[in-house]
């Protein structure tokens, strides 16, 4: 098969011909029809993810396609199924999985990180019966790949961890793919959304995707104070989807009393949290929670939003490109100035 491959962290990325994968006893092989490009893929290539331990390596973790082979122990998944899967695939048997929290599985499988990923014609996955998700018949593979880790992660962050309700004020700090996904989902469930970023282009897109207000943090003297003014008393829920000391502090300080902060963006290992928002945490009885991925059993709620017409994942897609573009696009991702998500299509146009 053809695959995108690199042999060292930060090294050259190229298309190569490698052996087709075979399924593990509990696994399956998926013929990839579409796969999304995510900043996590760039972090993996740069050596920021400890799960990548062996070379050569194939990146990619947001995909949709068709099951072409299954392991001997697989009972639910069938050859020919059109599927996607969470980027964190739970084993199904550890204590966390048994409690329904597959997204923090003790033995999680992550395509593109713990194993070769989906920037290839085929991808082998583990724990197939627990994690493969059948796609709605009217959902294209490109739309399903756009769900990826961004829309799925944002769905859990907004609805489960943030517990956003209709009429809530929700602030989203950082309007990359994850932040824009959070804007879309919060708006879809009836929240009043304030989007924050430092670039006008993603802020304009956030408004088109449902944000009621947008704030350019570079042009705002006090972002948290501006959110308090717009919402009258502060956000009910605020999400840091970027991951920096500044966005963390702004998110916490923008909350009303007894509000909820959801940390979704990853902070660097060198980041030190400022004391001001942590002191506010006590005085105002604020909640701070993390959010990581989405369990397989929670996907029907996400699909319901899409099928109802309240959420359209294709609105998040900025570019659709052939897989051959992936080496250049992955290496250039840190300088990408567009808005939205790039999806690589492996299906020839008809």
What are these regions (language model features)?
Residues 162, 204, 208-285, 349-350:
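Glycine-rich cofactor phosphate-binding loops and adjacent beta1-alpha1 units
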Residues 260, 275-315:
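Rossmann-fold dehydrogenase core element
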Residues 19-35, 48-95, 136-139:
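Glycine-rich beta-strand-centered segment in the early N-terminal region that forms part
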Residues 82, 169, 259-261, 287:
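Short glycine-centered segments of the SAM/dcSAM-binding site in methyltransferase folds
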Residues 33-35, 72, 88, 102, ...:
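Short, surface-exposed secondary-structure boundary micro-motifs
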Residues 91-173:
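NAD(P)H dinucleotide-binding glycine-rich loop of Rossmann-like/cofactor-binding domains
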Residues 82, 139-219, 225:
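Mid-domain Rossmann-like dinucleotide-binding core that forms the NAD(H)/NADP(H) cofactor-binding site
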């Amino acid at each position: 098969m053809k695959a995108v491959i690199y042999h060292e962290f930060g090294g050259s990325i190229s298309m190569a011909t490698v052996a087709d994968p075979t399924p593990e006893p509990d696994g399956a092989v998926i013929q990839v029809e579409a796969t999304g490009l995510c900043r996590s893929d760039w972090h993996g290539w740069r050596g920021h993810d400890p799960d990548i331990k062996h070379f050569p390596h194939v990146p990619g973790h947001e995909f949709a396609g068709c099951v072409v082979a299954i392991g001997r122990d697989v009972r639910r998944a069938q050859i020919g199924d059109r599927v996607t899967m969470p980027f964190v695939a739970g084993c199904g048997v550890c204590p966390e999985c048994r409690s329904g929290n597959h997204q923090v599985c003790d033995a999680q499988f992550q395509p593109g990180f713990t194993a070769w990923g989906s920037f290839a014609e085929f991808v082998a996955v583990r724990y197939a019966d627990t994690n493969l998700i059948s796609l709605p018949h009217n959902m294209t593979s490109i739309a399903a790949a756009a769900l990826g880790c961004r829309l799925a992660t944002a769905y859990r962050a907004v609805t489960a961890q943030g517990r956003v309700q209709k009429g809530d004020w929700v602030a989203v700090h950082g309007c990359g793919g994850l932040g824009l996904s959070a804007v879309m989902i919060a708006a879809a469930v009836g929240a009043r959304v304030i989007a924050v970023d430092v670039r006008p282009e993603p802020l304009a897109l956030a408004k088109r995707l449902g944000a009621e207000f947008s704030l350019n943090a570079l042009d705002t003297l006090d972002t948290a104070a501006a959110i308090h003014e717009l919402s009258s008393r502060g956000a009910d829920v605020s999400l840091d989807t970027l991951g920096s000391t500044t966005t963390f502090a702004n998110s916490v300080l923008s909350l009303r009393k007894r509000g909820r902060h959801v940390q979704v963006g990853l902070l660097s290992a060198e980041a030190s949290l400022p004391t001001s928002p942590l002191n506010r945490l006590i005085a105002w009885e604020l909640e701070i929670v993390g959010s990581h991925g989405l369990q397989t059993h929670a996907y029907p709620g996400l699909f319901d939003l899409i099928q109802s017409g309240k959420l359209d994942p294709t609105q998040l897609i900025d570019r659709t490109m052939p897989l051959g573009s992936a080496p250049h696009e992955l290496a250039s991702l840190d300088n990408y100035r567009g808005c939205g998500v790039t999806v690589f299509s492996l299906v020839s146009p008809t």
